Amino acid sequence: MARTKQTARKSTGGKAPRKQLASKAARKAAPATGGVKKPHRYRPGTVALREIRRYQKSTELLIRKLPFQRLVREIAQDFKTDLRFQSSAIGALQEAVEAYLVSLFEDTNLCAIHGKRVTIQPKDMQLARRLRGERS
C-alpha cells in the first residue's frame, strides 16, 4: 500500500491511548521466576502473637538490669543522698516492678476489650488503675 500524506485534523476531545512506560513493558515481558524474589512477610498480627506466647512462657527479666539500677538510684536520691543498695535489693525491686507492670497491662487489655477494641489506649490504663484504687 502506498504511503499518503497526513493532514491535520481537529481533535474530537477524546483521550489518546497512553504509551506504556519502558519499565512496565519490560516487567510484563520478563518471566515471573527470573526476577528477584521478594522477602517472606507474615500476616499482620502473626509475629505479635508469637512474641506474646514467647514472653508468657519465659521467666527472665525484660527490663535491662543497668538502666533499671540507674533509675532506682536516681529516684532514691530525691529522698536521701548517698544511699547504697545491695544487688539483691535491686533484683527484688526489679522483680516486683515487672510483676506489677505485667499485671497492669493485663488489666489494661481487659479494659480495651471491654471497650470493644483490641488496641490499648491511655484511658484503658487510667481506668485499670482507678478500678484498682491506685488513683482517684
From Swiss-Prot:
Location relative to the cell: Nucleus; Chromosome
Residue numbers carrying Phosphoserine: S11
Residues modified to N6-methyllysine: K5, K10, K19, K24, K28, K37, K80
GO molecular function (one): chromatin-protein adaptor activity
Modified residues (N6-acetyllysine): K10, K15, K19, K24, K28, K37, K57, K65
SMART domains reported in the protein's UniProt record: H3 (SM00428)
Modified residues (N6,N6,N6-trimethyllysine): K5, K28, K37, K80
Cellular compartments per GO CC: heterochromatin; mating-type region heterochromatin; nucleolar peripheral inclusion body; nucleosome; nucleus; pericentric heterochromatin; subtelomeric heterochromatin
Family matches, as SUPFAM superfamilies: Histone-fold
Residue(s) carrying N6,N6-dimethyllysine: K5, K15, K28, K37, K80
Similarity-based family: Belongs to the histone H3 family.
PANTHER family, per the entry: HISTONE H3 (PTHR11426)
Known function: Core component of nucleosome. Nucleosomes wrap and compact DNA into chromatin, limiting DNA accessibility to the cellular machineries which require DNA as a template. Histones thereby play a central role in transcription regulation, DNA repair, DNA replication and chromosomal stability. DNA accessibility is regulated via a complex set of post-translational modifications of histones, also called histone code, and nucleosome remodeling.
Quaternary structure and partners: The nucleosome is a histone octamer containing two molecules each of H2A, H2B, H3 and H4 assembled in one H3-H4 heterotetramer and two H2A-H2B heterodimers. The octamer wraps approximately 147 bp of DNA.
UniProt protein name: Histone H3.1/H3.2
